[in-house]
Amino acid sequence: MTPLIFVTGGVVSSLGKGIAAASLASILEARGLKVTMVKLDPYINVDPGTMSPFQHGEVYVTDDGAETDLDLGHYERFVRTRLSRKNSVTTGRIYQNVICKERRGDYLGATVQVIPHITDEIRRCIDEATASFDVALVEIGGTVGDIESLPFLEAIRQVRIERGAERTMFMHLTLVPYIAAAGELKTKPTQHSVKELRSIGIQPDVLLCRSEQVIPDSERRKIALFTNVSERAVIGCPDIDVLYGMPLELRRQGLDEIVIDQFKLSGTASLADLSEWEDVVDAIKHPLDEVTIAVVGKYVDYQDAYKSVGEALKHGGLRQRTKVNLKWVEAQDLEGSDMAALKDIDGILVPGGFGDRGFEGKVLASRYAREQRVPYFGICYGMQAAVVDYARHVAGLEGANSTENDRQSSHPVIALITEWRTTTGEVERRDEKSDLGGTMRLGLQEQRLKAGTLARELYGRDVVGERHRHRYEFNNRYRTQLEDAGLVIAAKSMDDTLVEMIELPREMHPWFLACQAHPEFLSTPRDGHPLFIGFVKASRARKAGGKLLREVCV
């Protein structure tokens, strides 16, 4: 059985369970262990695919097309294991599975209850996602004490009874607040949080104590005494200035050794080599250049909606020792044709989105970048905005639009995808009446790049795979007309039916590229992504007056 580390949170939400868990996973991976991660989310939605970005933030997409919590993005940025729909489990999915089994008669007429049926299904999902790994980390969303989390906590309590301490570990993340008026850290919230956890039968093995300051040894001893946790296993997690430095901090305090000792993995695990993370932190702390990128979106008041985009831009910068400053621009603010927000920036990125609100602002951002020769990177809706701009203002297709926003458009250059092949080769069909949830073109899809294009130069190969999440697509009826007007179709699906990337000729624009997929989902701090690296480099070149001041790469 795979050893399991269950990560829970207490006192308040948003303490960073996902980052802490992913950081530990990265250390264990660096020790030669095969690691995976699972997120258990207590909400009743089947997945976050139809949830508002203002409430939930980004919907992260895996290779197999699962629409998941943004924490899976953190996981994949810290560990090299590629995750799937098995790694994201919600209350909605659990209940859906149980109800389907009940309807089929799988329970043989039994009364279906939270215990054992719901908890058994939770345990089955955990087992399915973690089989064949050396270690798995399972994060339980929410905060201890939330009624929604109780079935998950009961399920992991049962797992501990079944597997024992040598195959399970409970890691609890709490807050140790600093009270300025008293001038001291307070441990009482942590004590009460552990008391709440123990009341449902779970005794933490490790405490991760979040705080603004370093926790003194005297306070760590106090926490250990009142929570029945070894002092060695009370780990301080002070605020740090570089997120990707967390693996180094946890390694310094020996968290991985606690795991290795409890699971008796010393014969399997090697010494941790965290040199890659040291290089990442060094590149972030000591940049040699700096650029400002305008991100023109429609959810900019809640930047978690673009979490992977922001991180991918920073990754693209750190691969060149360049600090990337993000200027968040509300797309609607551009619709009065006031482009002041786009002055004095080095590049423009237009990310994905849905619906007509703000779309015209994105079109205007594309036009501004095209006419002012500012590096432009369009992603998903950002590509569609670029196509609409080009159709209207270069190809002369007055009224060109997406049918998502105007079904009566005289020139629907972007239209609903009605048919495509999935990753398994099956044909899927959709229409305007299809359910919103889980009905998009989703997951990793291969595409063929056109020789001689900027895209082909950046990737360095002919065929690439990127993750998708969209319903609307470039309308092939206008492909020839737009190409005749100068637009370059830089990539198409493997069956030649779907336009995947567009760009402008380099004699027309120094760097103008847009893609229908979401490359941000494959960017990591250790490797970056070719498109983001190229975009940041082009932005540096613009800032330098057409040529790079420094050619640096880590």
UniProtKB/Swiss-Prot annotation:
UTP binds at S13, K186, T187, K188, P189, T190, Q191, K222. GO terms for cellular component: cytosol. It is an enzyme of class 6 (ligase). Keywords: ATP-binding, Glutamine amidotransferase, Ligase, Magnesium, Metal-binding, Nucleotide-binding, Pyrimidine biosynthesis. Mg(2+) binds at D71, E139. It comes from the Bacteria. Its EC number is 6.3.4.2. It catalyses: UTP + L-glutamine + ATP + H2O = CTP + L-glutamate + ADP + phosphate + 2 H(+); L-glutamine + H2O = L-glutamate + NH4(+); UTP + NH4(+) + ATP = CTP + ADP + phosphate + 2 H(+). The active site is at C380, H518, E520. ATP binds at S14, L15, G16, K17, G18, I19, D71. Residues 292-545 form the Glutamine amidotransferase type-1 domain. The keyword ATP-binding applies. Allosterically activated by GTP, when glutamine is the substrate; GTP has no effect on the reaction when ammonia is the substrate. The allosteric effector GTP functions by stabilizing the protein conformation that binds the tetrahedral intermediate(s) formed during glutamine hydrolysis. Inhibited by the product CTP, via allosteric rather than competitive inhibition. GO terms for biological process: 'de novo' CTP biosynthetic process; pyrimidine nucleobase biosynthetic process. CTP binds at S13, D146, I147, E148, K186, T187, K188, P189, T190, Q191, K222. L-glutamine binds at G353, Y381, G382, M383, Q384, E404, R471. Pathway: Pyrimidine metabolism; CTP biosynthesis via de novo pathway; CTP from UDP: step 2/2. Residues 1-265 are annotated as: Amidoligase domain. GO terms for molecular function: ATP binding; CTP synthase activity; glutaminase activity; identical protein binding; metal ion binding. Catalyzes the ATP-dependent amination of UTP to CTP with either L-glutamine or ammonia as the source of nitrogen. Regulates intracellular CTP levels through interactions with the four ribonucleotide triphosphates. Homotetramer. PANTHER family: CTP SYNTHASE, CTP SYNTHASE-RELATED. CTPSs have evolved a hybrid strategy for distinguishing between UTP and CTP. The overlapping regions of the product feedback inhibitory and substrate sites recognize a common feature in both compounds, the triphosphate moiety. To differentiate isosteric substrate and product pyrimidine rings, an additional pocket far from the expected kinase/ligase catalytic site, specifically recognizes the cytosine and ribose portions of the product inhibitor. Belongs to the CTP synthase family. This is CTP synthase. The gene is pyrG.
